[in-house]
Amino acid sequence: MVVPEEVSHFRPINLCNVTYKIISKIMVNKLKLLMAKLISPYQNAFIQGRNIFDNILLAHEIIDTLKKKTDRKKGYGALKVDMCKSYDRVSWNFLKTVLISMSFGNYWVHRIMECVSSMQYALLLNGSPTHTFLPTRGVRQGDPISLYLFLLCANILSIALIQG
């Protein structure tokens, strides 16, 4: 967008110190090893050994099959979920519950929640920064660990949709 017209059109800039980046990278390297075991086989993006293109092909096959269905009495359907700005909406309490339910240890849960909740925001108004304020939800965009935390939360949605 060339000229933003609403606050929602702005995207935050992720500024982290070197120590945070090192800690985050170490945690990501450990999380990567677990993701294939923790995440549903239907989630293919960003999981080692899986390919996102598999889901694209599957989606095309499903749509093609739905178009060919002649039995209108049975309920067939497809659902497309718009994940727009979903990083900003991840509940920290939900994330903590997900981590605990997936048997992450107290040390890991505490460290991850420290990473998530340590961010602050400030706005530039007429070139001058405002006072900082603290968010109560969301994960940092551009932070490598945020991707994996988001996948863990989105996996719960995937499971709920599958189970009906």
Model-derived features with residue positions:
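Nucleotidyl polymerases of mobile genetic elements and RNA viruses
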Residues: 1-164
